A protein has these predicted regions:
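Feature captures the catalytic ectodomains and active-site-proximal regions of enzymes
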Residues: 1-395
Length: 395
């Protein structure tokens, strides 16, 4: 079954890391990996403005589900390339922002185990991983007379550390800073950095404003849709469709107003409809664990008690069958699951005794509430989750 990793896993020679290094090369900054040839072709034309707009989870399969072939996005689709592993926002956006593979930058998933703190930490919020209250029960009945889990079943999020654990223990220099330090000019347009545009329209307005200014420049822009909506409603919901169609129209309008600009639209990963389980319903598995799994519901990082290390593989397969590919730490490192760069110091300490990779539509959450409210997912080992578009508009 490990052959599935080799055939369906990421293409680390044609992925987000390579696109990032194409940008670095174009603006005279030092590269750390090969470039993406399909992007180099357009970058070589010397447009005054180069914009990379990353739309979270707007993968190739999502374009095909929702948008017309002759629409702006699909008619300008120049290539389909690969996310990284796991195909998820923390790992993938850090790869495009750093030009590094996940095994180099260490931002491996939504919840990362930090041995320095001996905690599973939600990287972006710097809180201890979400957990369920001991003895929690569902307390709301829906219209179908089914019990639902409320947020009152969850423990209050607690700060993991005084300073960001991820930036403290896994620092990296982003490509905007690297280009500026190399003598180029680069700017972000995302809600997390000044001037903190807090809507998609404001992100696009900032792109237009920067492109109108004189001089050669690179702009990296990011927005968290359609990922946010698809997590809550699935990939084919009316809500997801409306968001995706609206975003395409707004980007098309922006492109019509630009000049001497290369606009590249891409995604960090794609998205799929998930069949969700909660690991707390499998005590035979949780009894084996030192702590609840980290990383992602479709890439589970297991630290196993000594007395179960030999039997865990059999116990896991008994409960979850062939829905996951279970790898040992040694196999994860030997197979270069997280990238083909040089392993970051301490990487092996962040990887558990076993890592389970989803090869079906099943996801395993640590709380019943999350399993209930997240019908859309990603971060597993299916081709659908990896394939991302290279949309190119020249103006």
């Amino acid at each position: 079954m490990i052959e599935k990793l080799r055939t369906d896993g990421p293409d680390y020679n044609r992925c987000l890391v390579n696109l990032s290094n194409s940008i670095l090369k174009r603006f005279g900054a030092e590269t750390s990996a090969d470039t993406l040839k399909s992007a180099d072709e357009y970058l070589a034309k010397g447009h005054r403005n180069v914009v990379v707009l990353l739309l979270d989870a707007m993968g190739t399969s999502i374009l095909e589900k929702h948008l017309a072939e002759d629409g702006f996005f699909r008619s300008n689709l120049r290539d389909t390339f690969s996310s990284v592993y796991p195909p998820t926002t923390v790992a993938a956006t850090t790869s495009i922002l750093s030009g590094l593979y996940p095994n180099e930058h260490g931002w491996l998933g939504w919840d990362i185990y930090f041995p320095q703190l001996d905690k599973n930490v939600t990287a972006f919020t710097n809180t201890v991983q979400m957990t369920e209250k001991e003895g929690a029960t569902p307390n709301v009945m829906n219209k179908d007379h089914e019990f639902e889990w409320g947020t009152d079943s969850l423990n209050e999020p607690a700060p993991a550390s005084e300073q960001s654990a991820a930036f403290t223990y896994l620092p990296y220099k982003n490509i905007v800073d690297r280009i500026n330090e190399a003598g180029g000019s680069a700017f972000p347009s995302m809600r997390f950095l000044p001037p903190f545009p807090d809507s998609f329209e404001k992100v696009l307005d900032r792109i237009k404003q920067l492109c109108d200014e004189p001089g050669e420049k690179f702009i990296y822009a990011y927005w968290d849709e359609p990922d946010h909506t698809m997590h809550r409603t699935g990939t084919v919901s009316t809500a997801s469709h409306d968001v995706i169609v609206s975003m395409e129209e707004k980007v098309k309008e922006l492109a019509s107003k630009l000049s001497d600009t290369l606009l590249i639209v891409t995604a960090d990963h794609s998205h799929m409809d998930s069949r969700n389980l909660c690991i707390l319903d499998y005590p035979e598995v949780t009894d084996c664990l030192v702590r609840l799994p980290s990383l992602e519901p479709r890439t589970l990082n297991f630290y196993v008690k000594d007395e179960y290390k030999d039997s865990f593989s059999e116990i896991f397969k008994k409960n979850f069958g062939d829905d996951f590919l279970l790898l040992t730490r040694k196999e994860v490192l030997e197979e270069k699951l997280f990238g083909i760069g040089t392993d970051r110091e301490g990487l092996s300490d962040m990887i558990g005794d076993y890592v389970a990779l989803a090869v079906s539509d099943v996801s395993i959450f640590n709380t019943h509430y999350e399993a209930q409210v997240m019908p859309g997912g990603h971060a597993g080992l299916t081709a659908e989750e990896f394939a991302i578009p290279l949309i190119v508009a020249e103006r």
